[in-house]
Every structure is written in C-alpha cells, then in structure tokens.
From Swiss-Prot:
UniProt source species: Bacillus subtilis (strain 168)
SUPFAM superfamilies in UniProt: Multidrug resistance efflux transporter EmrE (SSF103481)
Bilayer disposition of the protein: Multi-pass membrane protein
Protein name listed in UniProt: Uncharacterized transporter YbhF
PANTHER family: INNER MEMBRANE TRANSPORTER, S-ADENOSYLMETHIONINE_S-ADENOSYLHOMOCYSTEINE TRANSPORTER
Compartment(s) of residence: Cell membrane
Length: 306
C-alpha cells in the first residue's frame, strides 16, 4: 500500500474519532428540546443536504447487487445502529451501553475474517483488544465495578455493535467500486433516511421548526449534521476503504478517551487517576492493534506476512 495513502487513511480515522468523541456535548444540549429520534433524523437530513451541495453528482443505478450494498450500509450504519443504541439507553445504564458498543472492533474483525479477503484475525489485534477493553472498563466504571444487567437493553446495545460491524463490511465492499467518497456517502445517507421514515411514526417525532429559532440549537444541530454526520461518515468511509474494516474500527477505542478529555476541558469535570490509567491502556491497545505483521522470509527468498 502507498505510504502516503495509508497515512491519509489513519488521519481520516483520527479526525472522525476526534469529532465523534465530542458529539455527546451537542447531543446533551439538544435533548432539552428534541427527542433522540428527532436529533437522529434532522442531523442526517442536514448531512445529506450538505453532501449534495458539496457534490451535486449522484451515483447512477448500475445493478441490484451494488444497490443492495448501498441499502445495507444505510440500514446498518445509519438507521439501525443509532436506533438500537438510543433504545438501549432507555432500558439499561449508559455505562453498559458504552462498554458493550466498545466491542465493535472485535465484532468487525470477526466478520471481516469470514467475509472479506485479506483481513484475517491477528494475534496483535487480540492483544490490543484485551488491553483496550481493560482500559475501557477502568474509564467506564472508574473503580466502582457494580454488575447491573438489563437483558433487553444490553441485547439492544450488542445489536448496535453488531450492525456497525456489518456497516464496515458493507463499506469495504463498496470501496472496491472506486466511487467518489462523497457520492458514496450520499447514497448511504439516502437509504439511511428512507429506512428511518417508518421509525418516525413509531417514536416521538414532531415536525416543529420553531425549535430552530434558538441559535444554540441551530449550531449544535449543524455540528452534528455537517460535522459528525456528513464530514465524519465521509472520512470514516474513506478510512475503511484505505485501511480496511479491521484497522479502521480499532480507532473506535479512542472515543471514550476523547469523551473523557472533552469532559475535563469543556465541561470542567474532574479527571481521576483510574480514568487516566484507563485512557493510557486504551491507547496502548489501539497502538498494538495497528501494528503491522512482520514479513517472514521463506526458503525461496519470497516474503509472506506473519
């Protein structure tokens, strides 16, 4: 792989995670006036419009196989992931959801092992996963480990992790068609919004634009729609196409670390030594997961990846 291209893939993943790790601040503000379903719909509608304005060209229909991949990516990565996560939060503790969703990299690695060529599970990834998981446990429970299970909510959270892993597989397959990343993300958002429409009638959704008279609501929704949705899904999709589903997903380990840092810097919350240690172990896990396999020299002089 071209080093410059690989570096750009890592940078795209880091930019994505830096923004995703701070979205909780905007979501917290918006929840005072909007339901979770309303935030979800408006942010992706804004994101879709932004992508169309940036690049008006749309991918034409080619064949049903390709269209099913787009539909699957929209259903899994936009509609189901956020719906399942939001529903899970109403049935179980946020700490449970955070921990369960943090297994996305491992789920992605297992799915990629069986469904994608050239993306096999490696020992370094497993070691990195264990290190990151210990770190995330320290961050989430902060030394106060109390096992509080809620089967329905926890199953929903596990479902969210599973569908996001599936989304990465869909995006890796779609990257083979070499479409412009913005056009590709447009189509995924379009299907995500279409699949979201039935949910609008099932959940608490009110089409009340008066709430956008507040500058705070407008700015926070624009951040979620243009920054966290349009920009971040485009950069994430690019990263998956360049690095692969497994390497990209490992960056998800950073989300709780960034969330903790943002809480300290922006909300002036206290940082504990346990959370700091957890952050260090999580970043170590990410580093180990991203290590390249060493090349072994065969008897005939050819190289192979270990």
């Amino acid at each position: 792989m071209n080093i410059q291209r690989e570096t750009s893939g890592h940078i795209a993943a880091i930019v994505t995670i830096l923004i995703w790790g701070t979205t909780f601040i905007s979501t917290k503000v918006l929840l005072a006036d909007f339901s979770p379903m309303e935030i979800l719909f408006y942010r992706f509608l804004m994101g879709f419009i932004a992508l169309i304005l940036v690049r008006p060209n749309m991918i034409p229909f080619r064949n049903w196989r390709q269209e099913l991949l787009f539909a699957g990516a929209g259903l899994f990565g936009v509609t189901l992931y956020f719906l399942l996560e939001n529903i899970a939060l109403t049935y179980t503790y946020a700490s449970n959801v955070g921990m369960i969703v943090s297994i996305i990299p491992m789920i992605t690695a297992v799915l990629a092992h069986f469904l994608l060529e050239g993306e096999k599970l490696r020992l370094t990834f497993l070691i990195g996963f264990i290190s990151a998981l210990i770190g995330l446990l320290l961050i989430t429970f902060n030394g106060n480990v109390v096992l509080r299970l809620n089967p329905l909510g926890d199953i929903m959270a596990a479902g969210a992790a599973l569908v996001f892993g599936g989304y990465s597989i869909f995006m890796k397959k779609l990257s083979a068609y070499e479409y412009h990343i913005i056009e590709l993300t447009q189509r995924v958002f379009l299907y995500g919004l279409l699949f979201m429409v039935p949910a609008l009638f099932l959940f608490d959704f009110h089409f009340d634009l008066s709430r956008f008279s507040s500058a705070s609501n407008i700015l926070n929704m624009l951040f979620l729609g243009i920054g966290a949705s349009a920009l971040c899904f485009a950069t994430w999709n690019y990263s998956v196409g360049v690095l692969g589903a497994v390497k990209s997903s490992a960056y998800i380990y950073m989300v709780p670390v960034i969330t903790i840092a943002a809480s300290v810097l922006i909300l002036h919350e206290n940082m504990t030594w346990i959370a700091l240690l957890g952050g260090a172990l999580t970043l170590l896990g990410l580093y180990i997961s991203e290590l390249k396999p060493k090349a072994k020299l065969l008897e005939n002089g050819c190289k192979m990846d270990a």
